[in-house]
């Protein structure tokens, strides 16, 4: 039978026998997290990981020092996809309790769907699960959703999604979700959110080695993150019309699969030569960005686990941000800072758009030359599919979406990082 442990916060140091600068101590009343001076949320998250690692399956956050942010930090560290520990806390104000429950609902959706196996989350299932989640958090009657799949993708001109997914036995899909709280079917679309939804990425014929393929069930992390962000924005009161567009496919090897040298002709007329089938995320996102541009929104945001280059630059602790719109980038970075999430700008300039030459098409899907800035040229590729790419477009390369192994703050698996930033950014832009 499991016994609940009370956990307290203290600014006092632990007794010497617990070790120098000990973070945790224990007594008959429970465990105490020793923060020292200040209110270090990172220390709280690390303590939660330690308690989970010690097999503490039920926790009550007790005492007077627990507030919204400290409870949230503990939840982030304590959550474990294998153990599902029980976490309870003392009463918060109604406003803080509502916010905490909204964060948990949105980020738990994101973490759970990214952690699921590729067998559980095929492209059509990803689109369906995302639509069901948004419907569950939105006011009744404000959400409509359409899933375009298989040969219908070709009929409607979504060549990139179809081409990437044609090597799989699992049907590719594009989710076209409309959140419209205005009650006016002719209301302008304020924002379009585009997510990369590669539910498993083998690399295709540019095959990944096993150690790089082992986490590729999480290559739909951009879709999971941006769906969670929209969900949290809705729970926080988003009052403008938003389209959610998820570009879902499985990148596999077969006799039907995309081959090097193939050329894709996109709906906007751009032709792309395939020089690496493992640079597939940008190929599906291109369709989503074209569809987004057709609605003339004020804001286009795409999220994708797009490049290893971003992860090499930033590790797991930051997402990368790229944009030609400096003012909007600053607002996104400010939103991340307010939400205490890691977001870091990487360069994106006009000359990056010239680093994708092809002898047979308008563009290659990879850059040429030695020491190519892979994250920047991937974003530059996407810019060819955003009608007004200089203004109102943000690209998130989600380096911090998933951890292959546990750290001192996180269990292995999805983090949910970026959900709060996206929600705040959407709501702040909508209120202007």
Swiss-Prot record:
Its main location: cytoplasm. One of its GO terms (biological process) is proteolysis. Binds 2 manganese ions per subunit. GO terms for cellular component: cytoplasm. GO terms for molecular function: manganese ion binding; metalloaminopeptidase activity. PROSITE patterns: CYTOSOL_AP (PS00631). Gene3D superfamilies: Zn peptidases. The active site is at 208, 282. It holds the Pfam family Peptidase_M17. Mn(2+) 2 binds at residues 196, 201, 219, 280. The keyword Hydrolase applies. Mn(2+) 1 binds at residues 201, 278, 280. Its cofactor is Mn(2+). InterPro entries: Leucine_aapep/pepB, M17_PepB-like_N, Pept_M17_PepB, Peptidase_M17_C. It catalyses: Release of an N-terminal amino acid, Xaa, from a peptide or arylamide. Xaa is preferably Glu or Asp but may be other amino acids, including Leu, Met, His, Cys and Gln. The keyword Protease applies. Keywords: Aminopeptidase, Cytoplasm, Hydrolase, Manganese, Metal-binding, Protease. Belongs to the peptidase M17 family. Probably plays an important role in intracellular peptide degradation. This is Peptidase B. The lineage of its organism: Bacteria, Pseudomonadati, Pseudomonadota, Gammaproteobacteria, Vibrionales. The gene is pepB.
């Amino acid at each position: 039978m499991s016994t609940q442990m009370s956990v307290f916060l203290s600014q006092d140091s632990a007794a010497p026998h617990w070790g120098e600068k000990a973070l945790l101590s224990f007594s008959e009343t429970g465990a105490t997290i020793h923060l020292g001076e200040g209110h270090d949320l990172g220390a709280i998250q690390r303590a939660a990981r330690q308690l989970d690692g010690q097999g503490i399956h039920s926790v009550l956050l007790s005492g007077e020092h627990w507030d919204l942010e400290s409870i949230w930090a503990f939840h982030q560290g304590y959550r474990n996809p294998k153990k599902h520990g029980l976490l309870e806390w003392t009463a918060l104000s109604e406003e803080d309790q509502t916010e905490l429950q909204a964060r948990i609902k949105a980020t738990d959706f994101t973490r759970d769907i990214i952690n699921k196996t590729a067998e559980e989350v095929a492209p059509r299932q990803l689109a369906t699960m995302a639509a069901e989640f948004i419907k569950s958090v939105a006011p009744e009657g404000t959400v409509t959703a359409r899933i375009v799949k298989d040969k219908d993708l070709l009929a409607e001109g979504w060549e990139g999604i179809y081409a990437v997914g044609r090597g799989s036995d699992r049907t590719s899909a594009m989710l076209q979700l409309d959140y419209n709280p205005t009650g006016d079917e002719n209301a302008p679309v304020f924002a379009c959110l585009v997510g990369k939804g590669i539910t498993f990425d083998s690399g295709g014929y540019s095959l990944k080695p096993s150690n790089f393929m082992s986490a590729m069930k999480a290559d739909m992390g951009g879709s999971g993150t941006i769906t969670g962000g929209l969900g949290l924005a809705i729970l926080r009161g988003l009052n403008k019309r938003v389209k959610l567009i998820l570009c879902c496919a499985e990148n596999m090897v077969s006799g039907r699969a995309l081959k090097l040298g193939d050329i894709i002709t996109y709906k906007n007329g751009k032709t792309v030569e395939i020089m690496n089938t493992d640079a597939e995320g940008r190929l599906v996102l291109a369709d989503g960005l074209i569809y987004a541009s057709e609605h003339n929104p004020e804001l286009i945001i795409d999220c994708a686990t797009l490049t290893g280059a971003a992860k090499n630059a930033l590790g797991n602790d930051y997402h990368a941000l790229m944009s030609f719109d400096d003012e909007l980038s600053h607002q996104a970075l400010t939103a991340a800072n307010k939400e205490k999430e890691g977001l870091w700008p990487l360069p994106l300039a006009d000359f990056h758009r010239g680093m994708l030459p092809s002898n047979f098409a308008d563009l290659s899907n990879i850059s040429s030359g030695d020491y190519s800035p892979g994250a920047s040229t991937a974003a530059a590729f996407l810019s060819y599919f955003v009608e007004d790419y200089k203004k109102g477009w943000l690209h998130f390369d989600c380096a911090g979406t998933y951890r292959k192994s546990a750290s001192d703050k996180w269990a292995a698996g999805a983090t949910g990082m970026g959900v709060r930033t996206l929600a705040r950014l959407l709501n702040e832009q909508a209120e202007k």
